[in-house]
Amino acid sequence: DCDVICMAVGLTPTTELFWQAGAKMQYCPQLCGHVPFRDNTMRTSHPDIWVAGDASGIEEASAAMVEGRIAGFSAAKALGCKVKEESFKEYWTRLDHLRAGEVGEKIRGGICQVLVDGWEA
């Protein structure tokens, strides 16, 4: 079951739903605005909300699509679906390649500010 999927495109993260849900947020200029803290599965501090794409910070569309896969796999796993752990590793490797080099330096710096090791239950 899913109550809401929010999609947005732009140059500023659209994060009002995260604010309203009480997710922990951080202003991060490298990611072009306020974005939610998230773990490596793209889950926010709200246990039922994941973030991906422009809502997690403005970067390339290809990175947004990969983040969407990670968030989707994570949400499916949280609902009890079987998800291969290799899927997470494969998509994180893709993200690392997309964010590599000098071009991705700014994005990597921003992500370091909002990525957490995990959420306490």
Where are these regions (language model features)?
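Residues forming the flavin
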Residues: 1-121
